[in-house]
Swiss-Prot record:
The gene is nuoI2. This is NADH-quinone oxidoreductase subunit I 2. Signal peptide: none annotated. NDH-1 is composed of 14 different subunits. Subunits NuoA, H, J, K, L, M, N constitute the membrane sector of the complex. GO terms for molecular function: 4 iron, 4 sulfur cluster binding; iron ion binding; NADH:ubiquinone reductase (non-electrogenic) activity; quinone binding. Binds 2 [4Fe-4S] clusters per subunit. It catalyses: a quinone + NADH + 5 H(+)(in) = a quinol + NAD(+) + 4 H(+)(out). InterPro entries: 4Fe4S_Fe-S-bd, 4Fe4S_Fe_S_CS, NADH_quinone_OxRdtase_chainI.
Length: 178
């Protein structure tokens, strides 16, 4: 008899919960009209940023494409007249991108940055393949004063290895053997 009474009590408790929720106002947000507040660290669409001088930051080092778990980033490196590398073309397939942010972490020049913009819905899947021209923005992104090309990426003819500022002399590996 005790177990029957507990079953009736549990059933009545469930009905009471349902009865209370029956008179509450439904919480429905109409998405396109009412945007949800996103967290500060939201990662979504990738952009390519520029230097404070206005030049492209990407040096086509292929680190972003190597670290990408879904292989959605592809590019081709080229060299400018002054000896600096740049991406001749840069392509991201957002149909495959999982917005993990590994490409942003791997980028040594802070060229790739993830923005909180996430509304990239398209009916044609080919429109989700973004080229370099679609990804380049006219600002520095999160790192306003960072200028990778100020020192790096420029060939210098000032002495040999180990003779530059803040550079150690080369180590002879054979002399370090035990």
């Amino acid at each position: 008899m005790s177990s029957a009474w507990e079953a009736v009590r549990a059933l009545a408790s469930g009905f009471a919960t349902t009865f209370v929720h029956l008179f509450r106002k439904p919480v429905t947000e109409e998405y396109p009209e009412v945007k949800r507040a996103l967290p500060a660290r939201t990662r979504a669409v990738i952009v390519l940023t520029r230097d404070p001088d206005g030049g492209e930051r990407c040096v086509a080092c292929y680190l972003c494409s190597a670290v990408c778990p879904v292989s959605c980033i592809s590019m081709q490196a080229a060299e400018r007249e002054d000896g600096r590398r740049h991406a001749a073309w840069f392509r991201i397939n957002f149909a495959r991108c999982i917005y993990c942010g590994l490409c942003e972490e791997a980028c040594p020049t802070s060229a790739i940055q993830l923005t909180p913009f996430f509304e990239t819905c398209e009916r044609d899947i080919l429109k989700l393949v973004y080229e370099k021209e679609d990804l380049l923005v006219d600002h520095q992104g999160k790192d306003k004063e960072y200028n990778f090309y100020k020192y790096a990426g420029v060939t210098t003819d000032v002495g040999g290895k180990g003779e530059h500022v803040q550079e150690d002399e080369p180590v002879d590996l054979r002399s370090n053997l035990p």
